[in-house]
Amino acid sequence: MSQVRLRFAPSPTGYLHVGGARTALFNWLLARKQQGKFILRIEDTDVARSTQESVDAILEGMTWLGLDWDEGPFYQSDNFPLYKEYVEKLIAAGKAYKCYCSAEELEVKREKALKEGGKPKYDGTCRNLPQGADDGRPYVVRFKAPQEGTTYWNDLIKGKISFENAELDDLIIQRTDGTPTYNFVVVIDDATMGVTTVIRGDDHVNNTPRQILLYEALEVPVPQFAHVPMILGADKARLSKRHGATSVMAYRDMGFLPEAMVNYLVRLGWSYGDEEIFSLEDLVQKFSIENVGRSAGVFNPDKLLWLNAHYIKNGDPVRLAGLLIPFLKERGVTDTAGGPELPAVVKTLQERAKTMLELADGALFYYQQELSYDEKGVAKFFNPETPALLRGLFKKLGAVGELTTVAIEGVFKELCEEKGIKLGQVGPAVRLALSGSTASPGIYEMIEVLGLEETGKRLERAIAKLC
């Protein structure tokens, strides 16, 4: 059995969007599962719209998702001489021809066909003209498609799909300026790169019969095709910017983890029983193109958020700490060296944080020298007895050998018993003094992470400011 070869072939006219990322993921997974090759090809024949900035954004997005490639990136713009060579081969074989019809003439033909209730398609005016010198007139090159019979393929997702050849146009494969067209270069690239399986969006279904006819005319193997249903917004319209962020990297900047995005994207159309949580390693073992559904997937931001919260909650604190640094810098924390160890801080927050933004916001107070105190909390939890309670607590904390959460909890119990009070009469005031907020990580965990010295400083600052 020959090696499977799959490719992802984005156009560099923008960022890596969610739909493109899912297509790349499906191709990558099948290549990895079948121990094949995953090829990255940049389809930049639209020179006017293609930018290096977009190329960089696509590569960055794939790298962030963990989708490495075995070959490439290849650029179609490097292959214009090759495409020209194949155009000339088809003309010489009588399988393509020069068409001299002007845009105005074609528009007249189109309007006539519509008026007569027919399907607008080229009427073949130049199909059988002698293919000698073109005497300087502008022309396009058209593929001479068969006019009879049926073109079909067994789609790996959608099943058998067929088109009557009489319905297909004589496809333009080279424009008047000599540049090749999309449907033609895709076939040449896939053929010369030995691509065996093409997984792409189902907006390409109508291109497929035309491309199959080109493969056959070139006498090269036709790959297998799998057309993935599109992704819809909540209103069941095609996912677009009006539904929110569609760029993969925008989700990174919003505090989503790559493993959450990968997990979510693969479940947009693919299933494996009732399982919801998959690592990339799991997916390589379990993924199959046959289990991709035929119905469109609806993008659900809440489900993505749920997955992200799961991965933060169960993530390695050291890794999360490294990912957190850029978000802290955005919030003015440029150096965490003077504060508590960041992985320890993460441990106190990851249980509740849904995004890295929430994690960063929650971590901020650990590294602030001057806190802003919640006014309602101060009015509710600070009173004339508070200074004595806070100082009494600190004195007892100082007598503990090692500040562990268990030891700290014991100190609070001892203080409450000694003063004849409940935890609710001292705990909220301590929380406010240490974090400035009525909502924070657990009090015992906070004290353990801040350490005795910093805890004492914060208690005294709060007493000085609030009592």
Curated annotation (Swiss-Prot):
Assigned keywords, A-Z: Aminoacyl-tRNA synthetase, ATP-binding, Cytoplasm, Ligase, Nucleotide-binding, Protein biosynthesis
UniProt cross-references to SUPFAM superfamilies, sorted A to Z: An anticodon-binding domain of class I aminoacyl-tRNA synthetases (SSF48163), Nucleotidylyl transferase (SSF52374)
Main location: cytoplasm
Classification via Gene3D superfamilies: 1.10.10.350, HUPs (3.40.50.620)
InterPro entries to which the protein is assigned, alphabetical: aa-tRNA-synth_I_cd-bd, aa-tRNA-synth_I_codon-bd_sub2, aa-tRNA-synth_I_CS, aa_tRNA-synth_I_cd-bd_sf, Glu-tRNA-ligase_bac/mito, Glu/Gln-tRNA-synth, Glu/Gln-tRNA-synth_Ib_cat-dom, GluQ/Sye
Reactions mediated catalytically: tRNA(Glu) + L-glutamate + ATP = L-glutamyl-tRNA(Glu) + AMP + diphosphate
GO molecular function: ATP binding; glutamate-tRNA ligase activity; tRNA binding; zinc ion binding
Annotated Gene Ontology cellular component terms: cytosol
Pfam assignment, any one: tRNA-synt_1c
Motif ('KMSKS' region): 238-242
Superkingdom, taxonomy of origin: Bacteria
Motif 'HIGH' region positions after renumbering to this chain: 10-20
Binding site for ATP: K241
Subcellular locations according to the entry: Cytoplasm
Keyword ATP-binding set for record: yes
PROSITE patterns: AA_TRNA_LIGASE_I
Name of the top EC class for this enzyme: ligase
UniProt cross-references to PANTHER family, sorted A to Z: GLUTAMATE--TRNA LIGASE, GLUTAMATE--TRNA LIGASE, MITOCHONDRIAL-RELATED
HAMAP family (alphabetical): Glu_tRNA_synth_type1
Record's subunit section: Monomer.
Chain's role: Catalyzes the attachment of glutamate to tRNA(Glu) in a two-step reaction: glutamate is first activated by ATP to form Glu-AMP and then transferred to the acceptor end of tRNA(Glu).
Full protein name: Glutamate--tRNA ligase
Organism of this sequence: Citrifermentans bemidjiense (strain ATCC BAA-1014 / DSM 16622 / JCM 12645 / Bem)
